[in-house]
Amino acid sequence: MKAQVLLPKVFNFPFTYNSKIKGKIGNLVEVPFGSKKEIGVIWKNNYEEPKNIKIKEISKKTEYSIDKKLIDFIEWFSSYNMVPIGLVLKMVIGNTDKFINIKDDSIILKKTEKKNFDLNEEQFAALKFLEKTKNKFDVSVLQGTTGSGKTLVYFERIKKIIKKNNQALVLLPEIFLTNDFKSRFEDFFGFEPAIWHSKISPKQKRLIWKGIINNKIKILVGARSALLLPFKKLGIIIVDEEHDASYKQDEGVIYNARDMAISRANFERIPVNLVTSVPSIETYNNIKNKKYRHIKIFKRFDDYP
């Protein structure tokens, strides 16, 4: 049997390998490439190559895999943003070949003192509004002034999502990944958040990546690149400060993380909540055209900024 393996490199096509393993589409496998070993993903199976061509063999199958929904999203992301599909895969699996065989302990998220918070009437109404769509794809905008408790509303929604063994992704502009947000998260959930951004160490990235693909990490708070991580059971995406211009990446792989988050939620068939004090022009137009649902909260919530 032959298999097409996509590599996380600047290629717009997969490579054909002989396969004696029982590999499925989405399996991460080790393959020879030039003089090195590389980690790639089985993209297609039972692919017949013309005879009389020397084809190398898949070395081994790893314990990791990505699902068809993510594969479809990668293909769409590549086409929509005009980026080689191998580069998109690199954003998903990173430098996996450098750490996939390292036996790390699971990431340990420090437990903290948990505080009790009660939603006020307006926040409770907003939560119920957001929950109307249950577990299907939906884009809802939660708008509120600073200090109105928008964060508490989506924390409550996340709490219900992860109780069903699902995962949640909270996207924030990197500048907002502050100690203040971390403290609020810890006060509500009783443990420190797993955080993904450009400045975390390679070891921390390795542990988080494995925790995400194994469904050991239930909530990830991250900058824009986090939206391409291989979540095992993603249940909701929150885009906080959706109006912030830093969601647009202008160098390297060019994309708008807010828009791509909405698209990923569509492929996953899960809800996405856009959180803002003042909606962006694009979001405002989608609200006006009834493509996005919209709710406002006004009252200041003094106990929880």
Cite the ranges covered by each PLM segment.
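Accessory, non-ATPase domains that flank or precede helicase/AAA+ motor cores in DNA-metabolism machines
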Residues: 1-278, 282-284, 288-304
